[in-house]
A protein has these predicted regions:
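Amphipathic beta-strand/beta-sheet edge segments enriched in Tyr/Trp
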Residues: 25, 87-152
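Short beta-strand->alpha-helix linker/helix-N-cap micro-motif
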Residues: 28-93, 106-112
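Residue-level detector of Asp-centered blade-edge/turn motifs that repeat once per structural unit
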Residues: 162-164, 207-208, 251-252, 295-296, ...
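Hydrophobic beta-strand positions that form the internal "hydrophobic ladder"
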Residues: 168, 212-213, 253-257, 297-301, ...
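Multi-bladed beta-propeller domains
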Residues: 184-201, 227-245, 271-289, 315-331, ...
Length: 432
């Protein structure tokens, strides 16, 4: 019976080559055979009064796909087919799109519906000659619509959620103030969540996106506070000893790990999300700081100088089985565990005293370099929610700005040009 069923399935694939071709549309980004998928984005059509919106949606959509590093966006000047051929698969000349190398084809129409920007997205599998995705959305802005489209296309091809509707928190130092700002995932659309007149550092997101922890000096010493999103309402969380800083939520949002200095010694602590039930995890005479949770909440990576210089260590979430992870470099800091669990991103200073971003496997200790010869400082990495992109700080343009990069480091882009500069990025969770 099993052999008969397998034979029938094989026969169906032979009889329906489109189905077989469609199977190859899945992009396995982690595969050694990975190559970018060639995709044609036809100039978006517009309804009355929506011409500017259509242009904005198209440009943002293309920019989003380009940032992922997994698409090869074809030059519209190479297109052979008539852009007005319609959206019905039966009217599309797929052979002409195939002749220019397209594997995927995107068409869209953008309209105005009162205060909303509405859009229809069509995605086609060129080799199979059929439509594979159709979406209709209404959003408040053209950029929001574009991010929605990009997330859907990314999820179709990778079978993983897109991240372009997420936000990035960062710190902007202005004259006499520190702004906690929120940006879109492409580095644009910055808005100030809260302005602090005291030093504000190290924002990190709650897993549901409803709150951001940060380190505040409003009392004169470092304390951990939280800001409600989206209105920026603050609340105190932890004040302990000489300092409490660098708070990070556990993956379930019920606990926070942080650094505190009691009696002059910095160690890693945990507490409830409301600051209660504080418990010390490390008790080494050296400095222990910068905790980051594994995605399953069972382990914590942190920085310790117990070996003489700052290195990355890993321990169980209860503080047991502390072990050194990095043995290369003499100044390793700011670890951030990937949501996929397989890598920890961190900053390291090399032999030229240049700071760069690296990755290390928490299981094998194998190290990979993300940045090199791209300015004097690349630091403070933070992962996108799908673990496929990183944001970090660079000085390669003179002033500190944010870079989006794939983990391999061969696709990088400076995505901000803030006059005051931006530091301490934290990439937020997927929207509900």
């Amino acid at each position: 019976m099993t052999r008969t069923l397998l034979a029938l399935l094989a026969a169906l694939l032979v009889l329906d080559p489109a189905a077989a071709l469609a199977q190859r549309q899945y992009i396995d980004v982690g595969s050694p055979d990975f190559r970018p998928l060639a995709i044609a984005v036809v100039p978006f059509q517009s309804g009355p009064g929506a011409q500017a919106d259509a242009v904005d949606v198209q440009l943002t959509f293309r920019d989003d796909l380009s940032l992922t590093g997994i698409f090869d966006l074809l030059d519209p000047r190479s297109f052979l087919a008539d852009a007005s051929e319609g959206t019905q698969a039966s009217t599309i000349k797929f052979r002409r799109w195939s002749d220019v190398g397209a594997e995927g084809l995107v068409k869209a129409t953008v309209k105005r519906e009162g205060a909303l920007v509405a859009g229809e997205l069509h995605l086609y599998d060129v080799r199979a000659g059929r439509e594979v995705l159709y979406r209709v959305y209404r959003e408040r802005t053209a950029r929001a619509l574009a991010h929605r489209f990009a997330d859907d296309v990314l999820q179709y091809y990778t079978r993983e959620p897109g991240v372009f509707r997420t936000r990035i928190a960062a710190i902007r130092k202005t004259q006499g103030a520190w702004d906690i700002v929120l940006l879109d995932a492409d580095g644009k659309g910055a808005e100030t969540l809260r302005r602090e007149t005291a030093i504000a550092l190290l924002p990190t997101w709650r897993p549901d996106g409803g709150e951001i922890l940060f380190t505040s000096y409003r009392s004169g010493k470092p304390e951990i506070w939280a800001l409600r999103v989206p209105d920026g309402t603050p609340r105190p969380v932890v004040s302990l000893g000489d300092l409490a800083s660098g708070g990070v939520y556990s993956p379930d949002g019920r606990r926070i790990a942080f650094t505190a200095s009691v009696d002059g010694n910095s160690d890693v602590y945990v507490a409830g999300a409301d600051g209660s039930g504080i418990r010390r995890l490390t008790a080494d005479p050296a400095t222990d700081t910068s905790p980051t949770w594994s995605p399953d909440g069972r382990r914590i990576a942190f920085v310790s100088s117990r070996s003489g210089n700052p290195h990355i260590y890993v321990m169980n979430a209860d503080g047991s089985e502390q072990r050194r992870l990095t043995f290369q470099g003499n100044y390793n800091q700011t670890p951030r565990w990937s949501p996929r669990g397989d890598q920890i991103a961190f900053t390291a200073r090399d032999e030229r005293r240049v700071f760069d971003v690296f990755l290390i496997s928490p299981e094998t200790g194998k190290i990979a370099r993300v940045t090199q010869d791209q300015g004097l400082t690349n630091e403070e990495p933070s992962w996108a929610a799908n673990g496929r992109l990183l944001v970090f700080v660079t000085d390669r343009g003179g002033r500190q700005q944010l870079v989006i990069s794939n983990p391999v480091g061969d696709k990088q882009r400076v995505v901000t040009s803030d006059p005051a500069g931006l530091v301490a990025p934290s990439w937020g969770p997927l929207p509900p």
